[in-house]
């Protein structure tokens, strides 16, 4: 099964990063992944998701410092920048995937607020199933 992981927020990004690490170790090439966050430092802490696959959103609103635990702001930033997130997903290639998996922590703001916004957009655009892991 070919899966496109979207790590959303700090927790989601770290978990997606671990999936990519395991995929590399097994040389399976079954996973594609990006990480989306409002905090620049969280994105820089990833080890296995490539730099071009780390998407910083909300720069005009939170200037790369994250939204803390404010999931309302996380949802707003995601809504405002949903087109850039979808473009990032499209540019990584989706023609051969079997499913999308959005991974997010439920205690912060970026992942818990933004992941429902992204899930709705993915379901509207693609035929592949969209799963959430929180």
Tell me what each language-model feature is.
Residues 1-134:
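Tubulin/FtsZ superfamily GTPase core signature
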């Amino acid at each position: 099964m070919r899966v496109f992981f979207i790590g959303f927020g700090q927790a989601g990004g770290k978990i997606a990063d671990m999936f990519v690490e395991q995929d590399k170790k097994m040389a399976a090439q079954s996973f594609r992944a990006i990480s989306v966050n409002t905090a620049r430092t969280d994105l820089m802490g990833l080890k296995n998701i490539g730099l071009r696959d780390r998407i910083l959103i909300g720069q005009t609103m939170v200037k790369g410092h994250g939204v803390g635990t404010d999931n309302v702001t996380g949802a707003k930033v995601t809504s405002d920048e949903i087109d850039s997130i979808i473009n990032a997903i499209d540019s990584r290639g989706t023609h051969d995937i079997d499913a999308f998996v959005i991974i997010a922590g439920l205690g912060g703001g970026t992942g818990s607020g933004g992941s429902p916004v992204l899930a709705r957009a993915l379901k509207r655009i693609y035929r592949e199933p969209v799963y959430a892991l929180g």
